Amino acid sequence: SIDTIINRQYAIANNQADSIDLPKQRIYAMCNLRGGIGKTTLSFNLSYLVDNLLAVDTCPQGNLSFFYDNNYYAAQQTNVKDMLLPYLVPGLGKATRVASYIGATNPYFSKKNNYYIPSSEELYLLPSQLITAINQTAGLQQVQKEQALKSILYSLKTEIERELAENNLDKCIIDTSPFFAGATQLAWYAADALVIPVRTDQQSIKSLELLI
């Protein structure tokens, strides 16, 4: 209930809260179906606190990418949409070593071995492309259909695992957008756990209930 969240927030603000012993995971997705709740801010702050980390920006607004490189949109570098497209459009070659070293464009990260995969404005098109790719599996035999769907739905996870291995990284944070379709859906398949930022107001609680 909202009272539980308010009481927890009050205890934290007054240094009276005990830490919660949560299981440690490898890939986290920052999720909430409400905008302006702090997903990107929390993703950025956590990426600064943790070393050997991969940050993946799946929000088409690209705010997290901007925090790492305020000129990323003009850099013409391979982005998360480019990385996912070969799983949706047959015949395209798969990318490799997509992630960029954050310290190269943000000096505050120069002492950390952290990388990021930038966003793309074209992620707004991903939901329809994802649905089209899924619909194309309808005519396949059951085994083939299951293999094709698994390849599509776990495409982001496959690419994250590859980037983690290629860059010798330990953890991953995925920043998501406030809508579920497209890259956020793939982020849920990729993640070992969801981190859900919640403010202590009724609208935020409603959004949490909707997400769950």
Residue map of PLM features:
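P-loop NTP-binding core
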Residues: S1-I212
